[in-house]
């Protein structure tokens, strides 16, 4: 990602990234730092945050890390407050943290799975977006919100029931916020990755046989898996002034899988 260093499109900006210690979130943190931004990386995994801080030590005080449970409203709101206190401002928030559901179709899903997915994948995005909009409105200078949805937020057969519902809701929230606040200089967009080489599926110890068969229809041989770096490049573009007239959009990054 060294090309970002030669094109510091986020110089002088401050970004908050949830799920920032691994996978797509970690790549976004690194990409944004290389593009000149200061970053607050938030994650539930303290060990991973410490490792991230050590790995990116060259950025010094431009990188702060904080343990956050994104399903907890106070944690999310405190995260934004910390960024403002540490860096003096917040210009960008990336609501990226998320979990999967073992590709469970509705008949195999219990209430606990549904409620957990909604808390982490949807409520967290609402908390972060609401806090950001309130801050941006008070500051009066606009701002950028990027929500990590999924191909499953556009194509209903690519994931489990709870995961798909949560990501469709993220897309709807994104578009509503974009329209409601377009006249304030606030931009709100979503990235929709397809299959990507991250650890989000680590918890899927026993994926549903039916769900797996249905969700992967049309995938075999159609395209390779994406890399976190390919997703973070799209996020950096949306965060920059180069995307200044892009608002309320869902940017699909899936190598063509959704064309099936």
Swiss-Prot record:
UniProt entry keywords in alphabetical sequence: Lipid metabolism, NAD, Oxidoreductase, Steroid metabolism
Catalytic residue positions: 163
InterPro entries, sorted: NAD(P)-bd_dom_sf (IPR036291), Sc_DH/Rdtase_CS (IPR020904), SDR_fam (IPR002347)
Binding site for NAD(+): 43, 69-70, 96, 163, 167
Record's catalysed reaction(s): 3-oxo-5beta-cholan-24-oate + NADH + H(+) = isolithocholate + NAD(+); 12alpha-hydroxy-3-oxo-5beta-cholan-24-oate + NADH + H(+) = isodeoxycholate + NAD(+); 12alpha-hydroxy-3-oxo-5beta-cholan-24-oate + NADPH + H(+) = isodeoxycholate + NADP(+); 7alpha,12alpha-dihydroxy-3-oxo-5beta-cholan-24-oate + NADH + H(+) = isocholate + NAD(+)
EC number: 1.1.1.-, 1.1.1.391
UniProt keyword NAD present: yes
Keyword NAD: yes
NCBIfam families reported for this sequence: PRK07231.1
Family: Belongs to the short-chain dehydrogenases/reductases (SDR) family.
Matching PANTHER family: 3-OXOACYL-(ACYL-CARRIER-PROTEIN) REDUCTASE (AFU_ORTHOLOGUE AFUA_6G11210), NAD(P)-BINDING ROSSMANN-FOLD SUPERFAMILY PROTEIN
UniProt protein name: 3beta-hydroxysteroid dehydrogenase 2
């Amino acid at each position: 990602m060294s090309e970002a260093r030669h094109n510091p499109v986020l110089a002088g900006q401050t970004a908050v990234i949830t799920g920032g210690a691994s996978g797509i979130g970690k790549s976004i943190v690194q990409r944004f730092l290389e593009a000149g931004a200061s970053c607050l990386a938030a994650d539930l995994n303290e060990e991973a945050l410490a490792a991230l801080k050590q790995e990116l030590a060259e950025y010094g005080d431009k990188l702060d890390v904080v343990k956050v449970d994104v399903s907890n409203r106070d944690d999310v709101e405190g995260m934004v407050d910390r960024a403002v206190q540490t860096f003096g401002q917040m210009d960008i928030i990336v609501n990226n943290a998320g979990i999967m559901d073992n590709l469970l179709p509705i008949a195999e899903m219990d209430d606990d799975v549904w409620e957990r997915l909604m808390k982490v994948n949807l409520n967290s995005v609402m908390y972060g977006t609401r806090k950001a909009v309130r801050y941006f409105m008070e500051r009066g200078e606009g701002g950028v919100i990027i929500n990590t949805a999924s191909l499953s937020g556009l194509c209903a057969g690519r994931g489990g029931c709870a995961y798909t519902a949560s990501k469709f809701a993220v897309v709807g929230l994104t578009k509503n916020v974009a329209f409601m606040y377009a006249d304030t200089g606030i931009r709100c967009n979503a990235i929709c990755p397809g299959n990507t080489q991250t650890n989000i599926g680590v918890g899927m110890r026993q994926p549903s046989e039916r769900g797996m068969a249905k969700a992967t229809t049309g995938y075999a041989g159609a395209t390779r898996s994406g890399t976190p770096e390919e997703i973070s490049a799209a996020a950096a573009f949306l965060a920059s002034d180069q995307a200044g007239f892009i608002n309320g959009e869902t940017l699909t990054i899936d190598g063509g899988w959704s064309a099936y």
